[in-house]
């Protein structure tokens, strides 16, 4: 990633705090659908399985995982929707 996380301007935020598999990824799928092409989504999650599931989601569907960060028991992801 070329720019610092703090400088990223997100188009939407998905707060999946307190939710467990498969809910965060199901919500992510719907939220990404609502984004414009190349839109940036920030995901906040507390389920450790998102460390595996969200990167795989991005690879499988062609979205870019711009950044990911763990802060204690909170996991943050910045996902750029693929351009159509």
Curated annotation (Swiss-Prot):
Keywords: Cytoplasm. Its main location: cytoplasm. One of its GO terms (biological process) is tRNA wobble position uridine thiolation. It is found in: Cytoplasm. Coiled coil: none annotated. Pfam families: TusA. The active site is at residue 21. GO terms for cellular component: cytoplasm. InterPro entries: Sulphur_carrier_TusA (IPR022931), TusA-like (IPR001455), TusA-like_sf (IPR036868). Disulfide bonds: none annotated. GO terms for molecular function: sulfur carrier activity. Sulfur carrier protein which probably makes part of a sulfur-relay system. PANTHER family: SULFUR CARRIER PROTEIN TUSA, SULFUR CARRIER PROTEIN YEDF-RELATED. Belongs to the sulfur carrier protein TusA family. This is Sulfur carrier protein TusA. It comes from Pseudomonas syringae pv. tomato (strain ATCC BAA-871 / DC3000).
